[in-house]
Amino acid sequence: MKKILERLFNHSYLSYEESKKILKEISSNKYNDSQVASFLTIFKMRNPSVQEIEGFRDALLDLCIKIDLGSDFETIDLCGTGGDGKNTFNISTISSFVVAGAGYKVTKHGNYGVSSNCGSSDVLEYLGVRLSNDQDYLKKCLDVGGFCYLHAPLFHPAMKNVASVRKDL
């Protein structure tokens, strides 16, 4: 990690392969919190390249728990940005209700608030929604209400290793 951090500190970018590999290594707890915090801080200071985003995305797709909601549903995800840092209300969750109410199928993806007071999971738990990764339950939610929720920790358990660092940052 030290070599990667040194390169990034010198304004270099990671290749697709490096990005994918390092995210998988971070998720397997290969690095300490200081190294992970340094790595994450770099991406708060500069925008990632297309190759970095693609590598991170593909690593997350490889590591995630997959479900099949069937071909009966074409859904849209109205995932928010993860907090605006201004403690405004959770717009993406409310938007999901509006879109589902208009007749579209919504598969919302989100988490508890990290950089704000109120993430999508906070809102939905408060409203009594059961957070689940049970495929049959999620299909029923879509079928009956036009809305189902994918609580990120249930679908991306590998990211638990960075949760406390993200919260601290």
Identify the residue ranges that each predicted region occupies.
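Phosphate/diphosphate-binding glycine-rich loops and adjacent basic-rich segments that engage nucleotide
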Residues: Y137-L169
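Short alpha-helix boundary/capping motifs
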Residues: I67, S71, L127, H151-P153
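A generic, well-ordered mixed alpha/beta core segment in the N-terminal half of proteins
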Residues: G80, D84-K140
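Structural motif
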Residues: E74-D77, Y104-T107, D122, G146-P153
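Acidic, glycine/proline-rich low-complexity segments that act as flexible tails and inter-domain linkers
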Residues: M1-T88, A102, V106
